Amino acid sequence: MQSKLHVDKVITTVNSPSAAAHSPLAASWRRSATRHGHDPSDSRVAERLGQTDVECHRERLERFIRVATPRLDLLFGLVGLSGCGVFLTDDAGLVLDRRVADGDAAAFDGWGLGIGADWSEASEGTNGIGTCIAEMRRVTIHRDEHFFVRNIGMSCLDAPIFGPDGGLLAALDVSSARVDQTGAYNRLIGAMVAQAAQAIEADFFRASFPDARIVVADSDNIDGSVLLAVDGDDLIVGATRGARRTFGLEQKGALKLRPASDVLGRADGPVGFEKAERAAVIRALARAEGNVSKAARGLGIGRATLYRRMKRLGIGE
């Protein structure tokens, strides 16, 4: 009876001329039916790739998965005892890594949440992973919000993870089949998922620019890290998706070279040759703890030359 009611509700919503315009969930249901040709009563289980194919996909994201692993372990430590599983997918919704308790593994396998399973909307209709990827935002798909009737026993909470190029890289999912999982509990877990996804994004960004100075910028953006990678010449060489949006930079791909001081609106960066030279001399003196001879050696110039530059630049000994 519940199955029939769900199918009828989905079909009615899909056929409504206005529902999709007023509800993101209804819009996803319509995509599932009209764009992907799904029938909500379809009972087939999600398809899974073989181990060899999965390894090929994992190799493409090997460095990212290695960076993400500690955060996945930490998240599972927080939610695993409550019957939840933690899943990491690529940008196409393919499950590449998961954390589930031994006692829950069979249940998640039965739901089709195994390594190599395709949980894109094209494969599974409206669901946490696929809809998160399709809309590139945090989503919660609770039980009968799923498109397929076979998935209405689950609650899925997801957040996207964006790469250093600003493009979608992966999705982080926590799923549960507990019948007593409430909306309040979902909000709590959803906040944990979002925080973990943001931490993974920041960790991978830092790992992608090991020789750069990472600037954490102030922003009201709560959906992603706002980080800039700045090289030794004060040029921005990398920016997270949140930083790209905050500072009006290129949304994806390579960045046009810009001084960080221009973007951050600071007047104390090395703007102009004289200012850059003055900053370099002051840094050298600071490193030498005020010893002019040592500072001169660090700059590769003579002591007398450094004195002349200090006088010209208005730097007291």
Regions found by a protein language model. Name each.
Residues M1-S123, N127-F148, G153-M154, F162-D165, ...:
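Intrinsically disordered, low-complexity terminal regulatory regions
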Residues D262-A276:
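Short, Lys/Arg-enriched anionic-surface-contact patches
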Residues D104, F108, F247-A254:
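PAS/PAS-like sensory domain cap-loop motif
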Residues L257-R258:
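C-terminal structured domains
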Residues F273-E317:
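Bacterial C-terminal helix-turn-helix
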